[in-house]
Amino acid sequence: GVSSAASDVYKRQQMCIQELSTCLQYGLPIKIININNQALGMVRQWQDMQYGGRYAASTYEESLPDFVKLTEAYGHKGFKVTQRNKLGPTLEKAFSMKDKLVFVDVYVDQSEHVYPMLVAPNGSMEDMWLAKGKKA
């Protein structure tokens, strides 16, 4: 069979975590790669770019669950990746488990941004940020 993979961010995982039960019920061998920066990434990025790094209610290091343990509590397999050189081998291992749902929790630095980013509502291409400190 074909494996399905999804990339996600941790906050959305908390809103839909109960679906791990549905996946077990139907035997869905999905691979979930969770990009975990322990923050509301786009909110924090906006606070960096528009408000000079004045953060408010955008980081959650102390209050997050252990997603690997949570995944395993639902009967699936989970891996935590905290070092870049472990990512490739961990993904290979995850995708080799053809008959299991596997959750890979990948920690990234909170200062990492996603580009390009359109910062003006209904804006044009000229309103886009191409890199940190670099507008179109």
What annotation goes with each model-predicted range?
Residues 17-20, 42-47, 114-119:
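Short acidic, glycine/serine/threonine-rich loops at helix termini
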Residues 25-38:
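A glycine-rich helix N-cap at a beta->alpha junction
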Residues 87-136:
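Glycine/aspartate-rich loop-and-adjacent alpha/beta segment that forms the canonical ThDP
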Residues 9:
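Active-site loops and adjacent core secondary-structure elements that bind or stabilize anionic groups
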Residues 48-93:
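Conserved thiamine diphosphate
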Residues 1-6:
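Single conserved hydrophobic/aromatic residue that forms the stacking wall/gate
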Residues 13-14, 38-42, 111:
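Short gly/pro/ser/thr-enriched loop/turn and capping motifs at secondary-structure boundaries
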Residues 32, 78-80, 103:
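Conserved beta-strand scaffold positions in the cores of enzyme catalytic domains, especially
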